[in-house]
Curated annotation (Swiss-Prot):
Pathway: Protein biosynthesis; polypeptide chain elongation. HAMAP family: EF_G_EF_2_B. The lineage of its organism: Eukaryota, Amoebozoa, Evosea, Eumycetozoa, Dictyostelia. One of its GO terms (molecular function) is translation elongation factor activity. The gene is gfm1. Belongs to the TRAFAC class translation factor GTPase superfamily. Classic translation factor GTPase family. EF-G/EF-2 subfamily. This is Elongation factor G, mitochondrial. Its EC number is 3.6.5.-. The keyword Transport does not apply. GO terms for cellular component: mitochondrion. Mitochondrial GTPase that catalyzes the GTP-dependent ribosomal translocation step during translation elongation. During this step, the ribosome changes from the pre-translocational (PRE) to the post-translocational (POST) state as the newly formed A-site-bound peptidyl-tRNA and P-site-bound deacylated tRNA move to the P and E sites, respectively. Catalyzes the coordinated movement of the two tRNA molecules, the mRNA and conformational changes in the ribosome.
Length: 734
């Protein structure tokens, strides 16, 4: 098998693979030119859970010669898919961490990141899309657009990632690609257009017809190249109709193809393969259209044409505009466009950290310049310089050592102390990449080691997990002394508790899951507060006048200084600002963070001797409490968007279950004998739902959920939470 890293240089590098004692392969490499970048594709494979992402990646690796055998995600052989390298992934049949690999297709090279589909691990998708140039959005041919599909679409838009769609599982009963395309248009507002037509339905799926080449592809046993044939006679008219739709859709957003049609008597003359392919490529990279391909990864149908589509339609690193910020001038950031040039100063982004067999692995995307083993580079965010000890390319859990990597490449470094999202550059360069979006945790629980012997490893594990995953948070509750971990959901936290046991040999005791409640006000609340303390010697004095009201920036808090003149000097204003930050960390109602509050200081008074920063910080706490109580305070709870799929026969039971949990069904979709409910349910009422749904549907129902919004709790729950907090404080003060 030809290595990606050696072969990508047009055959100039000498292939020299040898098994080292440490289990890492070594590759001798020569330098490369910018021409090699145009043959490179960095793609992510993303989808809703169970749409077949990992199965598709397994086929891609097999057809490109990267692996010798195909293993299924939940295969009877117990091996599991190549990209699911964690024991937990193989046991649960889901992807938990994004996994990187690379392969060769024709004369082109593809870096692939297979991402999780479960919403609890959405940060893995977020950071993958942050560093990729293109993506394959995998859709289930039966279920179509699902909740996590919508989330992934939002993430792709956030990072301006062009994508192609692969409608998978067309061999399953009820599969309909045209329904899925219509959902892409209506639910995701994508200009989706089919490039293929399937031959056969469901279990009779034989292949696909390529609308660009107007050739049929029939797929045999796994590993065999598709047989290219003329279009079957019973498909000719339908193919003609779909090709017309394809050309007209592209022409509507591409002036070049539109002009060709005018000049060449369209539709009497159709664009040739070269003209149409170029137009699809232009509009895909510009994110004006989303090409749709079809097949069944499990049945080995449509995978090779998808690989062709990745090369034909998705951008190379030098075709995507990458912006960095020049921080060389203090307090002034200037946007600069990076170039995929190996001779330019090195710029790379650490997008993922992982505890490997040989220490911490730092995954790096190289945007500009060349990174070599032994180089001294700068961590712009931390202001530290480091020497690169080792460079590797990842193939799932396996590592292959390399001496250098160039622009567009994805690699990993050993033994580098940094955080996810840090930018590394050449020593004389001060560029930094823009940060990635990190969602706020929605659930917490208390955790402690079962025995004191495990304390050291417990602390080490928490520290490592925080570095690896920005959505995994750890804090110490000052009142109870408990360690509280927070994350994106039950499964997210469950996985980390299990990893602590397996990887660090620490048995833990966990408390009941805690919901991420928030506190806020519903109207303006005024304050006129004086803090005065005299106990001999210098006293304390601070007076503050102002108000608190709802913030105009949604859930964000704001501090506004409206003091005219020097009624409160600037040094004390800073103390008030710090005091406000203290107040919003722990609200006065139930001790949860405060959100959506604008705190305004309009006047005040000082004493020439007794006023101090401490006095004003204490006064802020009193002023905030006074305004908060006057502002009709309330508690907000997280509402989850829940999608439940089930056979129609269990409809009544499941609806009753949603109602019991105080949920609201906002949409119902019927597909054959199956139903999908879209609901909005308070997170506090979703605990244990997985077990209940299995019981109600005889194991045939499934659900997914993601955070939607925070909204006011009911009056009943409001009073209950206040009472519980009061009891807790009483117990702690005994």
């Amino acid at each position: 098998m030809t290595s990606f890293l050696t072969s990508r240089f047009g055959g100039l590098a000498l292939r020299n693979v040898m098994n080292n004692k440490n289990g890492i392969n070594s590759f001798g490499l020569r330098c490369f030119s910018t021409n090699s970048v145009s043959g490179l594709r960095n793609i992510g494979i993303s989808a809703h859970i169970d749409s077949g992402k990992t199965t598709l990646t397994e086929r891609i690796l097999y057809y490109t010669g990267r692996i010798k055998e195909i293993h299924e995600v939940r295969g009877k052989d117990g091996v599991g898919a190549k990209m699911d390298s964690m024991d937990l992934e193989r046991e649960k049949g889901i992807t938990i961490q994004s996994a990187a690999t690379y392969c060769k297709w024709g004369e082109n090279h593809i870096n692939i990141i297979d991402t999780p589909g479960h919403v609890d691990f959405t940060i893995e998708v977020e950071r993958a899309l942050r560093v990729l140039d293109g993506a394959v959005l995998v859709m289930c041919g039966v279920s179509g657009v699902q909740s996590q599909t919508i989330t992934v679409d939002r993430q792709m838009r956030r990072y301006n990632v062009p994508r192609v769609v692969f409608i998978n599982k067309l061999d399953r009963t009820g599969a309909n690609p045209w329904n899925v395309i219509e959902q892409l248009r209506k639910k995701l507002n994508l200009n989706a257009i089919a490039l293929q037509v399937p031959i056969g339905k469901e279990s009779n799926l034989e292949g696909v017809i390529d609308l660009v080449t107007e050739k049929a592809m029939i797929f045999g046993e796994k590993g065999t190249a598709p047989i290219i044939e003329e279009i079957p006679s019973n498909f000719v008219e339908f193919v003609k109709e779909k090709k017309m739709e394809l050309v007209e859709t592209i022409a509507n957003v591409d002036d070049e193809l539109g002009e060709w049609m005018i000049e060449n008597d369209f539709p009497n003359n159709m664009p040739d393969e070269k003209t149409l392919t170029a137009a699809i490529r232009r509009t895909t990279i510009a994110r004006k259209v989303v090409p749709v391909m079809m097949g069944s990864a499990f049945k080995n149908t449509g995978v090779q044409p998808l690989l062709d589509g990745v090369i034909k339609y998705l951008p190379s690193p030098n075709e995507k505009k990458i912006i960095a910020l020049d921080t060389s001038v203090k307090d002034k950031e200037t946007e600069v466009e990076l170039e995929s040039d190996p001779k330019k100063p090195f710029v790379g982004l650490a997008f993922k950290l992982e505890e490997g067999r040989f220490g911490q692995l730092t995954y790096m995307r190289v945007y500009q310049g060349t990174l070599k083993r032994g180089d001294t580079i700068k961590n712009v965010n931390l202001g530290k310089t480091i020497k690169v000890p080792r460079l590797v390319k990842m193939h799932a859990s396996e590592m292959e050592e390399v001496s250098e990597v160039g622009p567009g490449e994805i690699c990993a470094m050993f033994g580098v102390d940094c955080y996810s999202g840090n930018t590394f550059t050449h020593q004389n360069c001060s560029y930094t990449m823009t940060s990635m979006h990190v969602p706020e945790p929605v659930m917490s629980l208390s955790i402690q080691p079962k025995s004191k012997d495990g304390q050291a490893n417990f602390s080490k594990a928490l520290s490592k997990f925080q570095k690896e995953d920005p959505t995994f948070r750890v804090k110490s509750d000052q009142e109870s002394g408990q360690i509280i971990i927070s994350g994106m959901g039950e499964l997210h936290l469950e996985i980390y508790v299990e990893r602590m046991k397996r990887e660090y040999n620490v048995e833990t005791v966990t408390g009941k899951p805690l919901v991420a409640y928030r506190e806020t006000i519903q109207q303006r609340g005024d304050y006129n507060f004086t803090h005065r303390k005299q106990s001999g010697g210098q006293g304390q004095y601070a007076k503050m006048i102002g108000f608190a009201e709802q913030s105009e920036n949604g859930m964000e808090n704001e501090f506004v200084n409206d003091v005219i003149g020097t009624a409160i000097p600037p040094t004390f204003i800073e103390a008030i600002k710090k005091g406000f930050k203290d107040c919003i960390e722990k609200g006065p109602l139930i001790g949860h963070p405060v959100v959506g509050v604008k705190f305004v200081v309009s006047d005040g008074n000082t004493h020439s001797v007794d006023s101090s920063e401490l006095a004003f910080r204490i006064a802020t706490a009193g002023a905030f409490k006074e305004a908060f109580e006057d502002g009709e305070p309330t508690i907000l709870e997280p509402i989850m968007k829940v999608e439940i799929s089930l056979p129609q026969e269990f409809q009544g039971t499941v609806i009753s279950g949603v109602n019991r949990r105080k949920g609201a069904i906002v949409n119902t979709t019927t597909q054959g004998e199956s139903l999908t409910f879209e609901c909005e349910v308070p997170l506090n009422n979703m605990f244990g739902y997985s077990t209940e749904l299995r019981s109600m549907t005889q194991g045939k129902g499934e659900f997914s959920m993601e955070y939607l919004k925070h909204t006011n709790v009911s009056r009943e729950l409001y009073n209950q939470l206040l009472e519980e907090y009061k009891k807790k404080r009483t117990e702690e003060n005994k």
